[in-house]
Amino acid sequence: MHSPSVSSASTISAYSDDKQFTMRIKYGLYLSLFLGLSFSASAESKGPIRVACIGNSITYGYGLADREHEAYPVLLQQKLGAKYQVENFGKSGATLLARGHRPYFQQEEYKKALAFRPDIAVIHLGVNDTDPRNWPNYQDEFIPDYHHLIDTLRAVNPQVRILIARTTPIGVEHPRFESGTRDWQLQIQQAIEQVAKSADVELIDFHAPLYPY
């Protein structure tokens, strides 16, 4: 099991476009470096290596002036090159929790991610699970729900390489910062680390490199 560390993007809409763009550049560069070094396309490949970026608004590129060119999956595609096919399956507001206020499992992006049958899946979910509607009520379901997401990806491609991410920081500007979100996010980070071990997937860090930002 590997424990690589890569950089991250921010989810706080209060950030300037320049800062968001800079963070997403870091996000793409570090992630592409990691993937490129440790999972290269072989000469026997029948086609490009399929990379699914699964997540929430951070993956989707919400708040960017031009998400079609600035969202981190786009930057990742640029850095990895033609031997890879990177697709953005981010859904703004999505929760990992199946009983959260906007479950990723119920979104069209989830269905499309499975139909894509990725060779590599990068999952960054958990930020929206800190919502008071979610974590206080369903926190015991977070780890089982994460396992279910991993299992469904493995069902469509048993050889899929899965990387799950510690979540990006939540800034003091966020209206929920003082409502328990800070403590809940720490609990979610710990849960994600447990999932990485129990599901035998790789853990990457989208938090520490941007804290404090």
What are these regions (language model features)?
Residues 157-161:
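A short helix->loop->beta-strand "cap" motif at the edges of active sites that frequently abuts
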Residues 170-207:
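Substrate-gating cap/lid alpha-helix
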Residues 47-52, 58-147:
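Conserved SGNH/GDSL esterase-like catalytic core that processes O-acyl groups on lipids
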Residues 1-54, 58-68, 74-83, 114-117, ...:
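N-terminal secretory targeting modules
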Residues 76, 106-118, 192-213:
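N-terminal hydrophobic signal/anchor transmembrane helix of membrane proteins
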Residues 124, 165-166:
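Alpha/beta-hydrolase-fold catalytic nucleophile elbow
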Residues 141-144, 148-152, 187-194:
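Alpha-helical scaffolding segments of alpha/beta enzyme cores, especially the outer helices
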Residues 88-90, 166, 205-208:
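Residue-level recognition of beta-strand->loop/alpha-helix junctions
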